[in-house]
Amino acid sequence: MKSISTIAAYLAVLVLAGVSSLKSAEPGKIEGKAIVRSVKGVATYTTPAGVQKPLTVNTELTSGDSITTGPDAFVYVSVNGLSSAVRISADTTMVIDRMFRTGSAREGVHDTGINLKVGSIAGQVKKVSADSRYEITTPHGVAGIRGTDFSVSVASNGNGTYTVTFTSITGTVVASAVVNGAIQTKTLNGGESWTVGGNVVPVQIQLLQSQVNQINAMITSIANQINPAPVTAPIGPVHIRPQPSGGSASQ
């Protein structure tokens, strides 16, 4: 179960909402891209510069682009080359936080981060390099995914709080969230779901700063229970990005 330890090590860095990676590729990293494979209904994307454009088949997306689907719409997207495919359901807004790889598209290391603001996505992450990472961030927390069919949904309760459901369809998903100020972590195997709901508000930056070490310890403990071997994956610096206030998007 080496893959669980790998997920746990990287979740220690990106375990809560609001934690982001650098947007520009570091030396040796190749900027990835997402390609739209199918569109039904009305769907648009917005560039980091704020330019909104319609989504059509073969549209190429890069890090920082935000996708929005209308009622009764859905979009299929291949993300970061061969690493994954995602189905974006109706009334969904998600941001491609990062898409990098090193090495070849088939054999290299893939680093993908998606920020689901509101709505639902489902997808498949292929088994690639052991050092690859794939995270889905929500306002409550983050899920680390590897070699897995998964779904994540974010619903607004209409009062500034949200309900989030993480599901592992096959494989394993490690998810972490802050509920009533306390960190909770779950390991989901095929067919299992975890719903975080009620009066749970988006994670605040101050909490992110103060809880990173605690989260690291909790996830490392879970990894060691599954695989006693120590986690040796390198942990990089945490980059915390303030969340916009007063937005209407959930999760």
Task: Give the residues covered by each predicted segment.
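C-terminal interaction modules
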Residues: 1-31, 52-57, 76-89, 101-111, ...
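Short N-terminal segments immediately surrounding and downstream of signal-peptide cleavage
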Residues: 26-44
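Periplasm-facing N-terminal accessory domains of Gram-negative outer-membrane beta-barrel systems
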Residues: 45-46, 51-53
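A short, solvent-exposed beta-strand micro-motif common in secreted/extracellular proteins
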Residues: 65-71
